[in-house]
């Protein structure tokens, strides 16, 4: 069985990985940290590991999170409900999810911001269609 490495010098470890992290962040930071559209606005609260965006849509709150190789988008009346709706039923809550487009186990954690915003706009469209259909 392979044993996990033990980090004995945290500052040296952080200095060693800094160029890789900075390069990854530069590559994925291909869009704005805030965006809005008709009836919605969002702000990126974390740029990587996980990519996380929160905002308002039609008087509700939404939460987007991409981590590992997957992403989720959820809506609720409050911030807490929006987060909880991604893993349990909440009143007036809704969620959808999918897989990140990149290769590898961490394609969601390092998701390009343009991809995240596209998933958000597509999810808002899907949520609105469900609301109009009366399923909520």
Model-derived segments and their meaning:
Residues 2-136:
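Cysteine-centric segments in proteins
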């Amino acid at each position: 069985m392979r044993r996990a490495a033990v980090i004995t010098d945290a500052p040296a470890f952080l200095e060693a990985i800094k160029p890789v992290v900075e390069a990854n962040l530069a590559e994925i930071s291909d869009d704005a940290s805030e965006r809005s559209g008709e009836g919605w606005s969002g702000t990126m609260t974390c740029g990587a590991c996980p990519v996380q965006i929160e905002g308002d849509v039609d008087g509700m709150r939404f939460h987007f999170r991409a981590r590992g190789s997957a992403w989720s988008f959820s809506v609720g009346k409050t911030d807490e409900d929006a987060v909880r709706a991604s893993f349990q039923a909440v009143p007036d809550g809704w969620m959808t999810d999918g897989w990140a487009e990149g290769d590898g186990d961490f394609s969601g954690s390092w998701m390009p911001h343009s991809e995240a915003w596209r998933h958000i706009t597509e999810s808002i469209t899907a949520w609105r269609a469900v609301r109009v259909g009366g399923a909520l």
